[in-house]
Amino acid sequence: MLFRSFNYNGGSLDVVGEMLTHPLALFGLSDAGAHVGTICDASATTFLLSHWCRDRTADRLPIERGVEMLTRRNARHLGLHDRGMIDVGLRADLNLIDLAQLSPGRVELVNDFPANGKRLLQKARGYLGTWVAGVAVARDGVVTAARPGKLVRLQ
């Protein structure tokens, strides 16, 4: 579980907003699975869109900026110039989101690793579909059998 309270100074997330909107900041969070039994950071992107772009009353981020922070800025930084935007000739990696319904689910402990290994899992609501390279990989929370993605190695 990710403890956002560590940044909840003085009863406010304002300091996090300052970090998020700094021109040199990139939004990202992952331990690459190293702590799957003790940390679940899967809701970070859902929280950014639901809290900072929809629910926040002061200093709300425009939804376009939140999406850009999660997509184009990171893609450009990594040199992935065929991602992060919708345009002719680019990869069609897309999420269709119902922003009104978007919310992180409850954290669950599941035993689905080899040798009955445990991990924390957190699903989300409000993602209507996900496409990778133009192929549907999830619809209404159900993962399809399609696997059009491939490993990206940065030089």
Task: Report residues per predicted region.
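Active-site neighborhoods of metal-dependent hydrolases
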Residues: 1-60
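Acidic, glycine-enriched loop/beta-strand segments at the rims
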Residues: 5-16, 64-65, 75-109
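C-terminal cap of metal-dependent C-N hydrolases
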Residues: 18-25, 30, 96-142, 146-147
